[in-house]
Amino acid sequence: MGYSFDRASKDVVKKLQGRDLRPVECLSDATKFRLFHILQETPRSGWETEDIPVGFTLLDLLEPNFPVPEPEVSAPKPFIHVQSTDLEANLNVADIARGGVGYVGYGGYNIEVQSTSIPNPKLEILQNRKLLDKLPTFMKFCRMERKNLYVVTEAYEVSKDTMLTGLSSVNLLVKGFFKQLFKVRGKAGRSEKYSIPIPKGSVLAYKKQQLVIENNTCVILPSATKKKMTFPGTPKYASASEPTEIYRTELQGLWINDIEPIGRIQEPAHLDFKCLQYEVSEQTRLLPELSKDVQEVVLSSFLSMLYEGDRNVLHDLMKMLELSQLGHMDGPGGKILDELRKDSSNPCVDLKDLILYLLQALMVLSDSQLNLLARSVEMRLLPHQVELVTSILQPNFKYPWNIPFTVQPQLLAPLQGEGLAITYELLEECGLKMELNNPRSTWDLEAKMPLSALYGSLSFLQQLQKANSSFKPSLRPGYI
């Protein structure tokens, strides 16, 4: 149970309970969401939209020699969070074997956060200001593609250096069938300890307001509700890599936007799991069209990145592909870029779009889930995990409130020992409360998006592994 930066950010957002407050997901970008920084909204397919810092502030775009509003700074607010998990279970769910598995984990933070903001009355100073005659090149791209731009008007920054710490440990008592399977005796286990420094000034959460640019002047709307486009009146140049606006609206409705009042029994019929299933299958069916060599490079490269559980590398690769910049990267990300430069795959299949789709799903997950996915591939758990996640999503997807459900015992039977602990931890990280000895749980609306992204990631990796059945990832030290 790793306590990552993005998880801490989401937790702080929950505790602040601020309307329209969004968490910063990546520590490497934590200084790029400060006041006046400009963000480009980019769709993550069905999962959600992402705000990408463009590297400029609003002040960089306006004509010089103008007054700048003074930000309001709040007093630091302390946030302390400690979370621990202690799971223990027998391995005889289906009387396959006798033994035991235990998982112990803890993680948390002690952090001080303060808000810097520019309220709407103070923003009046910047309204209808003239832009520079020569604007940065990214503005031309955004105008042509009708990308919406936003400006950060409130940021919650860490007021002093702090540290995220944690430990996770799996202990496995193996007997009978599992003793033969794992070829170990008695107890075995794996333990990981970590610490993540968060420097002063890192932004954990922010609020944004939309920019509207017309007649070489800039207007800041009171909110980010997208009532207008940033570049109104500009014709849209369709991009093959993006879903249509209507389809994207439906997809976004799957998560939050179209939730009906609590008086309804369920959401509209078109907002069900079949829509997500169709989207994922449309992507995974294209993977077998790639050559075996390309598929193996993609699978092995992603496994290397997932083992590290470092979303910064995945995030950097995703941003490069979204901006169509095949620059230099070291490590496994560089191998994927090399394949994209070769452009030797099936001309009917866009390799960049497929890789981008998986990256967008993975970025919804936590750092510890990334590592758990790699171990799931290694233990060949994916088919069972896809079936289990499907059984949870399919009946509950359309319900916009918490309802109890029961995990089917026959779906747990193949997931024994460490495999069961890994799978349950994946589900817990999505926001579901799971107990190894109890198949009952409760559907939580907030788990809908991460659980859907987990379904997409598992399905994608399963298809790659199926096509590379002879591919055997090397076992990492300390891994059973």
Curated annotation (Swiss-Prot):
UniProt entry keywords in alphabetical sequence: Cell membrane, Cytoplasm, Lipoprotein, Membrane, Necrosis, Palmitate, Transmembrane, Transmembrane beta strand
Residue ranges, annotated region (Triggers pyroptosis): 1-226
InterPro entries: Gasdermin, Gasdermin_pore, Gasdermin_PUB
GO BP of this protein: programmed cell death
Cysteine-cysteine disulfides: none
UniProt modification remark: Cleavage by CASP8 relieves autoinhibition by releasing the N-terminal moiety (Gasdermin-C3, N-terminal) that initiates pyroptosis.
One cellular component (GO) term of this entry: plasma membrane
Pfam families attached to this UniProt entry: Gasdermin, Gasdermin_C
Domains as described in the record: Intramolecular interactions between N- and C-terminal domains are important for autoinhibition in the absence of activation signal. The intrinsic pyroptosis-inducing activity is carried by the N-terminal domain.
Family the UniProt entry places it in: Belongs to the gasdermin family.
Name recorded for this polypeptide: Gasdermin-C3
Species of origin: Mus musculus
